[in-house]
């Protein structure tokens, strides 16, 4: 498999090319989890993998708890579908607690404090209450904890990892910005919250779904993405192949096995796979800098054609422009007259490759504007 085929197959596996997902939920189920610390852009990561989901569609799924936002895996904020969160949280939590141990000690969160903090937060969100971070801080402080700054963040993360709390319905601040809330894990997840999987079964599911949605990729890519050990990923991969030997194939590149779904393999141009109309200018995609097309890989991220996330201009964060699956520039958006009936979106676009033509960029900007549901220019 050459570099062009790797890039094309990744685009297809990640549903950045047809066949696209029917909904944002389906896109998320394919990817299992996506990095989501920048909420509006994470919503776009899901929307652009569908046949037409809008920001409002994704926002409704988040508000209703079908898509949940929480800390797990490396750890950082992730979107996870509520049917996957129970087993993925149970698999990930011990590794994250281990990684957090030094910070727990530094912030005074020993075993007793952590258990009591979990109890305080569980009581705070009981009965269907959705509370902001500031409200959770007030509850912890009322119980005698010095819960601010880093300590507050780790009390909340501890409760997330233990299946006590998870994202609630976002609320709008006075400025119009959406703000995270927290709710009871069991109430948001539902019956699946009480159905844990054996670890081996979870590892097999993790490996099968990671390599199907991000292949071709390496064991190290999966280990770094998931926070699991290389040994656990190898075990999960072996179990997944034992259960379904035809689900994944491998190819060796520079002596390293890359695993992928054979039904998604793309030998043709990554811009326009066989069956699509070919555009000599190439296909442009606007992806967020934490998109899974970037963050889903570590050892083999070089196929992106540049380093991501992108912070190229005066230290200001920018997102990634792809030309046929390879980095070709950077972008960010600005909402003008937010909250008004005449709000519009203006993109700051920096193209690095002279061969990029405006038609492809016009199409990409139009897709983004359709997702936002507002006029969008650059």
What is each PLM-predicted segment?
Residues 1-294, 298-300, 305-378:
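Long, low-complexity intrinsically disordered regions
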């Amino acid at each position: 498999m050459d570099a062009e085929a790797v890039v094309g197959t990744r685009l297809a596996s990640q549903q950045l090319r047809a066949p696209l997902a029917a909904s944002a939920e389906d896109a998320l189920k394919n990817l299992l989890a996506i990095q989501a610390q920048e909420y509006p852009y994470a919503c776009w990561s899901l929307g652009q993998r569908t046949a037409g989901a809008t920001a409002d569609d994704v926002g409704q799924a988040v508000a209703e708890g079908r898509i949940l936002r929480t800390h797990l895996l490396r750890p950082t904020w992730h979107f996870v579908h509520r049917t996957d969160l129970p087993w993925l949280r149970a698999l990930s939590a011990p590794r994250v607690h281990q990684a957090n141990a030094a910070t727990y000690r530094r912030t005074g969160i020993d075993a007793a404090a952590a258990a009591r903090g979990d109890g305080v937060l569980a009581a705070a969100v009981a009965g269907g209450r959705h509370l902001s971070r500031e409200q959770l801080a007030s509850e912890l402080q009322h119980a005698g904890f010095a819960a601010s700054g880093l300590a507050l963040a780790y009390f909340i993360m501890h409760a997330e990892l233990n299946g006590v709390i998870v994202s609630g319905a976002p609320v709008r601040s006075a400025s119009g910005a959406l703000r995270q809330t927290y709710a009871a894990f069991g109430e948001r997840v539902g019956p699946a919250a009480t159905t844990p999987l054996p670890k081996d079964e979870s590892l097999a599911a993790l490996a099968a779904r990671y390599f199907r949605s991000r292949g071709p990729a390496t064991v190290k890519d999966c280990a770094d993405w998931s926070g699991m050990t290389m040994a656990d990923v190898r075990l999960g991969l072996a179990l997944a192949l034992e259960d379904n030997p035809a689900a994944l194939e491998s190819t060796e590149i520079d002596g390293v096995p890359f695993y992928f779904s054979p039904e998604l393999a793309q030998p043709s141009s990554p811009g326009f796979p066989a069956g699509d109309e070919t555009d000599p200018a190439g296909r442009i995609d606007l992806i967020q800098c934490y998109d899974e097309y970037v963050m889903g890989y570590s050892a083999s991220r070089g196929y992106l054609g540049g380093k991501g996330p992108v912070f190229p201009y005066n230290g200001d964060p920018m997102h990634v422009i792809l030309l046929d699956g390879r980095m070709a520039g950077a972008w960010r958006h600005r909402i003008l007259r937010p909250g008004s009936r005449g709000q519009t979106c203006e993109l700051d676009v920096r193209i690095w490759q002279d061969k990029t033509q405006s038609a492809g960029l016009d199409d990409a900007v139009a897709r983004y504007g359709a997702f936002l549901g507002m006029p969008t220019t650059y």
